[in-house]
Amino acid sequence: MDIKLINIGFGNIVSANRIIAIVSPESAPIKRIITEARDRGMLIDATYGRRTRAVIITDSDHVILSAVQPETVANRLVSKEAAQVDEPTD
């Protein structure tokens, strides 16, 4: 299994294979998920002090905060997958 990495902003990289969801932090349920992850010690803040614009939820129950828009992260994820499909295999 190949490890696919995705840039989530400011040089921070996450394994794309582990991402379950990329969501906006605005709703109350997502804010609750962030608070619960902080209490469990499963929160990773990759915003560098900037405003949180995307919340990435992984299959290991880690919650990652990013200062990049969810659409941008999703586009990077899709473009990485498309690039791998286009690569010739010998």
Swiss-Prot record:
Protein name: Putative regulatory protein Dred_1699
PANTHER family per record: REGULATORY PROTEIN SSL2874-RELATED, REGULATORY PROTEIN TM_1690-RELATED
Domain of life of the organism encoding this protein: Bacteria
Segments crossing the lipid bilayer: none
Similarity remark: Belongs to the RemA family.
